[in-house]
Amino acid sequence: MSNDVYFESIHMQSNYEEFETQAQERENISKISTSLSKFRKMSPKSTRSFKVKSAPLTNRKARNRIKSINAHVSAQYKVSNGQQNDDILDFFLKRKHNISSILEGVEDLENRNIVSNDTPQPSDNTGNYSSQLFTQEEWFQILRRIKLRFPKLSARTRKSLKYVTTKLEHLKNINSDDDSPQLWTQAASLPEEGLVNEDMKWLYELDDEQMDIGSSFCNVDEDSDQKLFVLTLSQAMGEREKSEPDVEIISDSSPEPTQLLNDGIIEEEHEVDEEEEDNENEEKSEKQLASSPTQISSDDTQEQLTNRAEISSYEASSLFPNTLETQKQPVKSTIQKQASVVVPDYPKISNVKDEEIILSSSPTRDNEIFQTPRKYSVESVRSSPSSRSGRLGRLMVSPLKLLSPDRLDASQSVYSTARSSPTKQKRVRGREVNEKIVRKRFKTSRVEVAGNFHLKASDDLKIVSTVDKVNGSEVEDSEDDDHSVSIIEITHEVNDEELKAVDEEVTGEAEDGPSIIQVPSSPGNENLQEDLTSMQTSIASVTQEVPSNYTATQMRQALRSLDFPPERSKEGMASSLTRAASIAGTSVSSLLTPDAPYEEVKNQIYSAISESVKKDQLWHERVLSYEPIVLEEFKQWLGELDKDLKFDVTFLQQYCDHMGITTTIGTTTGTTAGTNTTTTD
């Protein structure tokens, strides 16, 4: 054994020496290589440029780019070599019903265009006619609006637009036989007839050079007789110039009525006119309107004035004396003409110039205040004189004040643009009469009577015997029992003198024991005494008794459900259930049923304790300041306050945990809960 160990040790020693020798040689070689690397860095850099051979490029197939997607699609799916439509439809994921509907619509459209147009339409190489999306006039309008909307375009784009315009004019000259007006022509020709150069210059903010060339482009040399401008919506709704008047004008010796102006001119009038003067003005207006009937000869006036709420009844009427002619006001901020307005002739109040006059409003009553313009217009048409078989109804209800035309501002007109700021119309309110509502006042008295009570019948008094109140504070009335307790409620009407005496009695000048007087809607309600519920708890607890047919097990189960501490005697359990029933306003029998609402009863007990705490300032401040409440003191204070609130420390601890009140258990050095106390844990 020893020889083997010796041999192994010698072998290990030789291996170790050999390993040390190899490690020393490697260290020497690394030192030599490190010293030689310094000379390697000092070698000069070569100035020869080496050419890197690139890999040979493979011959790629040149793919022809698709010049037109339409040509590509037509080349892929056109019918050739007797190919059927079913083969084409199968290519579209077997959705034959969708493709069939599309093809039928395209074929119907092409056939309809070919039949409707007399002149041959341009066709492609395949002979298929193409449908015309826009007419020539529509293309002209599109190009003009592009130039106005984008005045700073590139030279290439501007040249393209000019080329398209030239082609369209050439086609227009060729097809000049077609005189049917298109939609764009009708829409564009309406506002262009009534505009002048100053209006165009103001509308598009053009300079003299742009006005000379007739476009917003500075270097456009195309000749065009038509104007290259577009109007706003409010100006497009203006009336077109006509050579003949649309309405019949009757001239008489009566003074010219004042023009009906914008809504912003109407102001609210003070209530200074008497009722007699209003009635006289109404009678004069009705006589004057009925004496000179006039028929409106055109329907355009009615269509153009449908948006005017204040004259909606006049435009539909056929019994008005005279009309107003169309007037054009060359104001810079309002580029339109006033529409024809039919106004009845009313006499002026004063002959002085620029005096304010009063015109009648629409025949809508003051109490008919509509929320939407749709309803307002419908009701105005229904109430107009024309809807009453030609009979003129009563018009003026509330006067409106209008200013004279000389006082008008430039920004106030019938049609306003974006630069004007019209004000809203103010409606004149009628006379309001303050009527005092007469209310009767009653006095209610509740009297507690012990024993048999007899009262003579009387017409002035109403005797009500309270039975089974919800709150449980009032018990059943048993007049046959001499030792029972009754509560009688007496209600009768009182006058002001009696009410004053009642207020003095409630404030504390007179105290009549348990009698409580309640006067609804009187100023003394805030100083009433405590509610009848808190005063009758002791009476209810005395009268309620536990029926004898219930066992102690049932009562113990009810106490356990209410989290009450267990009682040893049956009388103690009955007393606890009686106190809980009196506070919750229910009977003891209802607490002993299987489906009794124990959670609701427990919440009512918690509410009764909370109300008692809120009425005492000291205990309420302790709770609000998070001062730890000593449970023994709290129990003693509740027992002295009301015998129905006698609970043990365990139940009060559950109440405090439920309400989030801090508590502690310790001894006190004070005598009562109202003094300063110290607690020791």
From Swiss-Prot:
Q: Where is the composition biased (Polar residues)?
A: 251-261, 288-305, 518-528
Q: Where in the cell is it found?
A: Nucleus
Asked if the keyword Plastid belongs to this entry, the reply reads no
Q: Which BP terms in the Gene Ontology apply to this protein? A: DNA recombination; DNA repair; DNA replication
Q: Which UniProt keywords apply?
A: DNA damage, DNA recombination, DNA repair, Nucleus, Phosphoprotein
Which segments carry the region annotation Disordered? 239-305, 505-528
Q: How is the protein modified post-translationally, according to the record?
A: Phosphorylated in response to DNA damage.
One family name in Pfam for this protein? Slx4
Q: Source organism's superkingdom?
A: Eukaryota
Q: Which GO terms describe its cellular component?
A: Slx1-Slx4 complex
Composition-biased stretches (Acidic residues): 265-281
Quote the InterPro entries the UniProt record gives.
Answer: Slx4_ascomycetes, Structure-sp_endonuc_su_Slx4
Kindly list the GO molecular function terms attached to this UniProt entry.
5'-flap endonuclease activity
- Give the family per the record: Belongs to the SLX4 family.
Oligomeric state and partners? Answer: Forms a heterodimer with SLX1.
Q: What does this protein do?
A: Regulatory subunit of the SLX1-SLX4 structure-specific endonuclease that resolves DNA secondary structures generated during DNA repair and recombination. Has endonuclease activity towards branched DNA substrates, introducing single-strand cuts in duplex DNA close to junctions with ss-DNA.
Instruction: Specify the protein name.
Output: Structure-specific endonuclease subunit SLX4
Q: What organism does this protein naturally occur in?
A: Meyerozyma guilliermondii (strain ATCC 6260 / CBS 566 / DSM 6381 / JCM 1539 / NBRC 10279 / NRRL Y-324)
Gene field: SLX4
